[in-house]
Structures are given as C-alpha cells and as structure tokens.
C-alpha cells in the first residue's frame, strides 16, 4: 500500500521537476535577449559619450533612479520604470551634431526585451537607492547588470 503511494509521489516529483526546470534553449534565449539589451544600452551610451555631443553637460543635469539592489531579472522592473524619462532626456538632447537614430525605436526595443525577460507577472516594487544617477552612470550600471547576468548564464 505504501509502495504505491511512494511510487506516485516519486512520479509526481519527477514530473514537477521536469516541467519547471529551465531548459538550455530557454537559457540561450535569455542570454540572447540580454545581449540585445546590452547592445541597445551601449548604443545609447556611445551616442551620449560622443565627443561631438554639445548637449552632454545638459544631459548630465537630469537624474535617474537606481535600484538599491539589481541582481535578478525581476529587477529589470526598475529599468522599465525609468525608460520614459530616459527617452525624454534623449529627445531633448537631439541636435545637428548629436543624433541617436530612432530613439523611440531603441527605447521600444529595450521595453519589449525587458518585459520578456522580467516576465509579465512581475509586480516588484522597486526599492531605489537614496542617491540618483546621471544618465551616464544610469546606463553604465544597467550595462554592468546585463554583463553580470550574462556571465552567470554562460
């Protein structure tokens, strides 16, 4: 009698582990999405750091919120919340000498990737650090976040 219950328990446990365990293809997909996010963030940062950017000093006056801790994909919620202000600052800075092509598309791509990576169920309330960050610091920290997560996946 107990033997049947034990076998049922083992079978259910195996089914649960098999269905919930991440597969190598899902890890690869996550890694690719993070790499795309990383490239988009680096593209924005490179455009801002361009030596011909006369609006950089103005851009540095805008402050962005950073999470106290960003170590998991769910923390991308905090990046998502700052995308609109980021887009607004980038649009303000557009000029003849400084032009990020398709800022709206870049931000939209980042938003789509972030939503896929963090999952739709995430309702994390971001705990922000007391100090704010400049646009350069903001982008550098999220770039470092992506690199860190990618390194754990490989």
Swiss-Prot record:
Superkingdom per UniProt: Eukaryota
Protein name: Interleukin-2
Keyword annotations: Adaptive immunity, Cytokine, Disulfide bond, Glycoprotein, Growth factor, Immunity, Secreted, Signal
Disulfide topology: 78-126
GO molecular function: cytokine activity; growth factor activity; interleukin-2 receptor binding
Predominant subcellular localization, coarse grouping: secreted
Glycosylation sites: 23
Gene Ontology CC entries for this record: extracellular space
Gene name as annotated: IL2
């Amino acid at each position: 009698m107990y033997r049947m219950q034990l076998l049922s328990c083992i079978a259910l446990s195996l089914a649960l582990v098999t269905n919930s365990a991440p597969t190598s293809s899902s890890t690869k997909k996550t890694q690719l999405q993070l790499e795309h996010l990383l490239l988009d963030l680096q593209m924005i940062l490179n455009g801002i750091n361009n030596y011909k950017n006369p609006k950089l000093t103005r851009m540095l006056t805008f402050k962005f919120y950073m999470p106290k801790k960003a170590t998991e994909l769910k923390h991308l919620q905090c990046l998502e919340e700052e995308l609109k202000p980021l887009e607004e600052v980038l649009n303000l800075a557009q000029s003849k000498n400084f032009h990020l092509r398709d800022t709206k598309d870049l931000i939209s791509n980042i938003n789509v990737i972030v939503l896929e990576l963090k999952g739709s169920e995430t309702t994390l309330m971001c705990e922000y650090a007391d100090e704010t960050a400049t646009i350069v610091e903001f982008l550098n920290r999220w770039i470092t976040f992506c690199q860190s997560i990618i390194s754990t996946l490989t």
